[in-house]
């Protein structure tokens, strides 16, 4: 039984932002802000964010990390997303975002992909990601730092992880649509 201690009901936030006008406009919920060692996770049973672990000294989250509401990954957990904002947000932050691609990973033999999203373009405010429409627009060193971190983080957790490459935003959108269908199917049974 879920406790009603959280006034914010993340399950009621739609996957897609902008009323669906732009198929790549999505919502993201931040669990772990960038530049810290703590790993937070949303505890669905209690409706609150919880400290899940602390990563090794010398490693920090390179970008905000969270999930997409109303979407499940192949592992049955909320679909993971790296939010490539210039500055950190905070745990529990809801943001509109632009889907730009997907990092393909195998963790212990199972798909465990990470979507990549950027903040929306804001009139009068320049952001490093303004020119990113697809994953190919990302600088190679930025992608390398993300994939290196994900592999190191997984290995620290004693998971066998394999980097399988990256894919375009259209492939990321397909993964997101599949994840949204999985979420609807799971919640229809309740």
Predicted regions and their residues:
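Hydrophobic N-terminal alpha-helices or hydrophobic patches in metabolic proteins across all domains
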Residues: 1-190
